[in-house]
């Protein structure tokens, strides 16, 4: 009986020693957090292994993550994964539909991002920029001929339209001369003509009936306007004036001293044509509602695909600029030692307990062997 008790006692003692040895060894990975000194001498195994090698550990983990986990190829493959693309597209589409149920004006949106008085500030910026650009254009192009400023397509279009302008002028002239107003105007011109020529005019009026004479002039005027030579003359005059206009420099039409005033006027006119009140106060959803289907079916998938493709193409440069190894190292370095210990225990707690138990089992087994050997010796 004493032999069996001795063997069991040795097994219990060996198991306890083995378990405690492993438990202490595991604890010494983290504890103590700081070096302990006795008589100005640092005690061995202080601080613990992980606190002592913390910086080195963080550096190596960062290198391992970049070299074997977050590699350029792995990142590129993930970015080009169709499932990821679909997930991102679905998420953005869902967010877009949620936002479309709201009523958010550009003013409110800009206010949300800290841009106060958006409408006033934006219009002031547009007005200032527009006036500056017009002034710059007038100053830099003042010696340029109008023929060089007018686009070739517009110049050709205007040149081909001159005959139509001639037709319109003669048509308007015919309508006016043939009208009652035109007849009255001709009569008044005749009366004024006779009055301006004194006695000779008065004598002529004695032999001429103004009403019939004005009708005659009206008829002859209509014949003259309708003649092809008249149309050719008008067309020639228009062509000549157009050529003269093209030959002039910009400063001949707009003198330097009037440029600033003209720029201000043009800017004011252009600003007034902008529907800025509607633009800044109409809900964005109202503007986009007609394009909602196109945005969800085409724009969002295309934008996501292009974005992921761009990031994948430049993944090497992005990873290099981000310096992921340094990022991981820095993040690990920010963890406190209790946090690192807690993290490791949460991940490997079961395995660490098994190591402790294994130490107890091995210690107990060794104790049994020692007990048996002690009986034999």
Swiss-Prot record:
It comes from the Bacteria. It holds the Pfam family DUF445. It is found in: Cell membrane. GO terms for cellular component: plasma membrane. The chain crosses the membrane at residues 1-21, 357-377. Keywords: Cell membrane, Membrane, Transmembrane, Transmembrane helix. It is a multi-pass membrane protein. Belongs to the UPF0754 family. This is UPF0754 membrane protein lmo2224. It comes from Listeria monocytogenes serovar 1/2a (strain ATCC BAA-679 / EGD-e).
